């Protein structure tokens, strides 16, 4: 597929059988089964470098926050932080650009993808400014009308050792 939302549409429409690196959400449970998490990562807010580190997300009352359209965190934010104004974006780079330009206060995603992208492309302008208590539990999602498929992937995930997980992280993390 060309982007995350197209991937979600394909799995919903049963044009594909699995989707990797997906977090469970109430909505997604209506059409997917999930393995246990492969990776568990903190959810963070990226801000401009000159913004203060936040101790409490309520300090952003009525601020615009960008979130990737279709990201599980959007449901969570709408439920638990309704005072934040969500701006859905088509890509992470679009969200980070809006932060850089001052059109939104921050962009929310998991720490792994954000820290890597900030270091590569936005190191002079953006930083991690807040960490939520919620975690992004990246799992494999399978069509819920194919329970045997979920059993197979669940066994594969159960067999992953910590060395393999660390190799994956090392591949995608810049130090």
Regions found by a protein language model. Give the residues of each.
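Proline/Glycine/Serine-rich low-complexity intrinsically disordered segments
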Residues: 1-175
